[in-house]
UniProtKB/Swiss-Prot annotation:
Name of this chain's protein: Protein-export protein SecB
Pfam families for this protein: SecB
Compartments in which it is found: Cytoplasm
NCBIfam families (UniProt xref): PRK05751.1-3 (NF004392), secB (TIGR00809)
HAMAP family the record matches: SecB
Known partners and oligomeric status: Homotetramer, a dimer of dimers. One homotetramer interacts with 1 SecA dimer.
Classification via PANTHER family: PROTEIN-EXPORT PROTEIN SECB (PTHR36918:SF1), PTHR36918
GO CC annotation, single: cytoplasm
Amino acid sequence: MAETNEKQAAHPEFRMQKMYTKDLSFESPSAPAVFLDGGSEPKVELNLQLNNKKVDDDHWEVSLEINAKVTADDGAKTLFILELEHAAIFWVRNIPEEHLAMVLAVDCPTLLFPFTRQIASQVSVDGGFAPFLMEPVNFMALFQGAKKQEQEQTAN
């Protein structure tokens, strides 16, 4: 019985405990004129950043920051600017140190991203625009690319 409890205690596990919006800003500097102009295909500048912060021995805050600027196709008129930092507290226990970076950079943001995407979409609709739909993000590919770049830099 004690052996079973020891195996359970050492079992790696993580879960999202709380999700929240840390920062949210939406601006439409060209309103109301932008709604009267004939619509054209907008130009989107998007920056997505992942941040991780250890809260205590068992908890990590993982946040996704989105900075988006949407302009008319000629770039002369800003339709809207969206800034969002959406975060979650993850309970992380018994994850081997060599796997922790991957859990925080891949698994956690993969769980968080659909909710972050929904907030961004809803805010743009509430601002009078079409839904701002971001493509799904392959966090594993980003993690592997960062690791490869890190290895190349240490080799030089």
